Amino acid sequence: LFTPQISRPFRATDHEPEIMYVYPTTAQLPFGWRWRYSGVGLVHQSNGQSNPLSRSWNRVYLMTGMELDNRWTVTGRLWKRLSESADSDDNPGISDYVGRGELSVRWNVNKDNTLGATFRSSLASSDRGSVRLEWMQALGSGLWGGKSNLRLHTALFSGYGDSMIDYNRKRTVFSLGVSLVDF
């Protein structure tokens, strides 16, 4: 399962602090869908390294989300990279690889299982972008027998931008971990 020559449990640590404003909505949409929110945000993403391994970028984004019967969720984001001077830009062209937008779909199969897919696109003539497929499964039960906030998180990623250091290399990555949700 783990081979030191080809596997690294913590190969990269990327940081992504952000600030956002979310406007809740309750608008009814066709076919039973509900528009749940819209928002705007500012995000900085960095790998925290020094040159020549340094990678970072800043962007602003618009987002929205809708749901159907608390079982299906569709969210979308469009972003614009904030310009940097050519001599301080760690990763020119990152938008052409990581993308300029994403669409996520989540399906709550039952109270213990959620399936998801996220698609990123450069929204340009190139065919770069990525796809991430995810499965989250509840682990155990919560306090006093209630719903557990712990999930086994399994993901398969294919495309560009899985990590900042390799943003311009196409990769396929299988991930397994634990997530905290609904706390």
For every predicted segment, state its role.
Residues 61-63, 134, 151-153:
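Residue-level detection of beta-strand scaffold positions
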Residues 116-150:
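Glycine/small-residue-rich hydrophobic helix-like segments
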Residues 133-137, 154, 171-183:
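Outer-membrane beta-barrel "beta-signal"
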